[in-house]
């Protein structure tokens, strides 16, 4: 259910972009992200930091897009969000508190060196997505960027999450694997 909530603003953004324009879609994205945040809190009594960061970025850059009537701001939002996620993972790694381990470490037991590899892999992933978005956003037509944002980045994230899950499963202690099966 929580994952479905995460995709609703993106679906609304895409649909309204196709029906109207980037400005209508951006306004709807701001509203849908706010509603998503409220629903997440009501249903789960907790909001993840990533959701809060995304909401703030959507509101700031989406607001600038609408107010200044310049779609470059919403394009920058995607790049900056991915860069902030990568920077957060880097800082946490330097401080010796890998975020991925904090998110999954209660359910999954892995050696620290495996958690570090996963953390570094996600740093690379978020950095690559940030750079890829820069290229597509500013070198391709708006339609291509919207499709890339909705389907390309979403698809890449889904695949990367699956690959991470496979890596985790491969390195889980044998008794934990048996419990999961």
UniProtKB/Swiss-Prot annotation:
Pfam families: IspA. Keywords: Cell inner membrane, Cell membrane, Membrane, Transmembrane, Transmembrane helix. It is found in: Cell inner membrane. It is a multi-pass membrane protein. Disulfide bonds: none annotated. It comes from the Bacteria. Coiled coil: none annotated. The chain crosses the membrane at residues 22-42, 50-70, 80-100, 118-138, 148-168. Its main location: membrane. GO terms for cellular component: plasma membrane. Plays a role in cell envelope biogenesis, maintenance of cell envelope integrity and membrane homeostasis. Belongs to the YciB family. This is Inner membrane-spanning protein YciB. It comes from Aliivibrio salmonicida (strain LFI1238). The lineage of its organism: Bacteria, Pseudomonadati, Pseudomonadota, Gammaproteobacteria, Vibrionales.
């Amino acid at each position: 259910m929580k994952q479905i909530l995460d995709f609703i603003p993106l679906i609304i953004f895409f649909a309204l972009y196709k029906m109207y324009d980037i400005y209508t879609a951006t306004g709807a994205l701001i509203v849908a992200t706010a509603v998503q945040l409220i629903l997440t809190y009501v249903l789960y009594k907790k909001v993840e930091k990533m959701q809060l960061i995304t909401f703030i970025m959507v509101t700031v850059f989406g607001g600038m897009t609408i107010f200044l009537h310049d779609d470059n701001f919403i394009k920058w939002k995607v790049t900056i969000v991915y860069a902030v996620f990568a920077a957060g993972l880097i800082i946490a790694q330097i401080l010796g508190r890998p975020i991925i381990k904090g998110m999954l470490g209660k359910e999954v037991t892995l050696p620290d060196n495996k958690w570090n590899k996963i953390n570094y892999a996600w740093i690379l992933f978020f950095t690559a997505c940030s750079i890829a978005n820069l290229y597509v956003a500013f070198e391709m037509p708006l339609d291509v960027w919207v499709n890339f944002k909705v389907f390309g980045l979403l698809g890449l994230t889904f695949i990367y999450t699956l690959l991470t899950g496979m890596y985790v499963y491969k390195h889980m202690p044998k008794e934990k694997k048996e419990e999961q099966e």
